[in-house]
């Protein structure tokens, strides 16, 4: 009887491990493994396998809890909006104090971490939800290519490397390589995640559906799984 129970426990443990590995492999095959040379060496590139069979990408941010996300620069103020006076300003500039810490907004894997032309020191994270975020002009990157990071993890120190006139974080949100206004997803005035469903077509057209938040959205780190 004791031997039978031991065998049963072992079988359950192996089954659980296999299921967990299968979930992880499925998650990684979506966006997070086998980066190409282009993905390793460019801040902007398409995300393979992002769209479903109908050609849509969907992410429901209303279901995220306080542990699933973080504002990139806590206490920061937007000093230059998306677009703005510069026609091709593809993100927002967030200003705070010198040597402040920049945090990963969602969990995911570091796809890029090195200098890139006018961006200076840059970090690009491909997230479990399929989005990518970019953080640049960093004085120092705290993460390396291939690292897995969780929401709220320190990833860089604010700086003014590259084409920058003051210490700040240039922050971008990209879906399939296309930049979208971060204010669609984050209320930057009060540092909150917007409770929205994001729908993007393969042509790049975006639709934002406002929803009621299911739970609180105050910052705190942890990983979530892929949106379906």
Where are these regions (language model features)?
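Polar/charged, compositionally biased leader and regulatory segments
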Residues: 2-6, 15-81, 192-228
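Short, glycine/small-residue-enriched coil/turn segments at secondary-structure junctions
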Residues: 63-71, 83-115
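Conserved positions in beta-strands of structured domains
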Residues: 79, 95, 109-114, 139, ...
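Solvent-exposed coil/turn segments that connect beta secondary-structure elements
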Residues: 83-85, 97-99, 107, 115, ...
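Zn2+-dependent peptidoglycan hydrolase active-site motif and core
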Residues: 89, 104-142
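Conserved, short, structured surface segments that act as functional micro-motifs
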Residues: 127, 147-208, 216
């Amino acid at each position: 009887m004791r031997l039978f129970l031991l065998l049963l426990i072992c079988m359950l443990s192996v089954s659980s491990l296999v299921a967990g590995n299968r979930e992880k492999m499925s998650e990684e095959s979506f966006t997070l493994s086998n980066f190409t040379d282009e993905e390793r060496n460019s801040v902007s590139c398409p995300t393979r396998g992002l769209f479903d069979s109908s050609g849509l990408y969907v992410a429901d941010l209303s279901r995220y809890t306080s542990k699933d996300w973080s504002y990139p620069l806590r206490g920061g103020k937007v000093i230059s909006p998306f677009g703005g006076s510069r026609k091709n300003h593809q993100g927002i500039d967030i200003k705070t104090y010198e040597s402040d810490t920049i945090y990963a907004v969602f969990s995911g894997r570091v796809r890029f971490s090195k200098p890139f032309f006018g961006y200076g020191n840059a970090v690009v994270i491909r997230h479990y939800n399929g989005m990518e975020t970019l953080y640049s002009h960093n004085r120092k990157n705290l993460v390396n290519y291939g690292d897995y990071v969780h929401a709220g993890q320190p990833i860089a120190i604010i700086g003014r490397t590259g084409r920058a006139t003051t210490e700040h974080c240039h922050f971008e949100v990209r879906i399939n390589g296309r930049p979208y206004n971060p204010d669609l997803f984050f209320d930057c005035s009060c540092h909150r995640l917007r409770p929205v469903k994001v729908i993007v077509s393969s042509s790049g057209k975006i639709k934002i559906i406002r929803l009621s938040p299911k739970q609180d959205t105050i910052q705190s780190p942890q990983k979530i799984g892929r949106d379906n």
